[in-house]
Amino acid sequence: MKLCGGIDLHSNNSVVALLDEQDRVVYRQRLANDAPRVLEALAPYREGIVGLVVESTYNWYWLVDALMDAGYRVHLANTAAIVQYSGLKYSDDDSDARWLAKLLRLGLLPEGYIYPKEQRAVRDLLRRRSRLVQQHTANVLAVQNLLARNRGQSLNANAVKRLTPEAVARLLPNPNLALAVQSTLLAMRGQEAAIELLEREALAQVRGRAPYRHLLSVSGIGPVLGLTILLETGPVERFGQVGQYASYSRCVGSAHLSNGKRKGHGNTKSGNKYLAWAYVEAANFAVRYNPTIKRYYQRKRAKTNGIVAIKTVAHKLARACYWMLREGTEFAVNRAFA
């Protein structure tokens, strides 16, 4: 008897459901989020299980890793692409788990990519760095806003980063205001050290790879953007076509058209936000420093606007990087922006 399993994963528990080939429930149980307990519950049905579906929630790593290490065939459900019948009168965790298992049995499951565990940890270093950069920027803005409120004028970001306790005391004679700025500066110093540490460690593990060196040949891509693109892309072979990669990088439109008219738009958040950021950043740098790309950008901007033109350049760079990673070649600006 072949069994398909669905696991509705939550923060502290999971609902496991196993269905046979006639969609009959063979096993259903709510289990604590404990890998040995989940494996123990599945053990009696191991020989019949042909696949297990896990929701791609924020905490799926531990469960997918444990199931794969135990030899199960695991599928990661792309929850953003799974749509249940909107007229359902009632649904709960049990029905969600059964629905995942049924989609797998029917071959209709929208799947997410399970990034290899070893490489995933390096990629997450870059994601942590990105979060720290955002927090650091928020602290810079907080200092600028405080100075503007209390002095009528502010400082640029570089001047804020160079502030010393003595300079803060001169700018803000009020000790409470000075302490507020100094405490923010202390947090910024810690963030800067952590950002440098994460970047250095990720670079040490990736620097020797040929695909990384090829990415650095692209106009606008430096060490951080190269790391981000390489690690967020993963094995480029998982994208069957260049258009799929461009879509995953959020570099394509999402308009719904009918009879030449716009009827709405699709899911603009579908894809990888880190790749989307990296390619837009690379596009801005490329336009600034590469004459060929700058001319292309100016032609597009004359027909549309700056935002659309930059996104078009980002799309071109994403397509170029796809072929570079796939073929192991370096960047050729005349091919990408002919």
Segments predicted by a language model, with ranges:
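Gly/Thr-rich phosphate-binding beta-strand-loop-beta motif of the actin/hexokinase/Hsp70
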Residues: M1-D20, L100, L132
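Glycine-rich, often acidic, oxyanion-interacting loops/wings at catalytic, nucleic-acid
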Residues: L126-H214
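Acidic beta-strand-to-loop metal/phosphate-binding motif
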Residues: I49-S56, L100
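Low-complexity, acidic/Ser/Thr- and charged residue-rich accessory regions of DNA metabolism proteins
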Residues: G260-K261, Y297-A338
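Phosphate-backbone recognition surface of nucleic-acid-processing proteins
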Residues: H214-S217, P223, T228-I307
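Short, basic/hydrophobic alpha-helical segments
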Residues: A35-G51
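Short alpha-helix plus adjacent loop in nuclease-associated cores
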Residues: H75-R127, R131, E166-A169, K261-S270, ...
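Short glycine-rich, Thr/Ser-proximal phosphate-binding strand/loop in the N-terminal lobe
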Residues: N12-P36
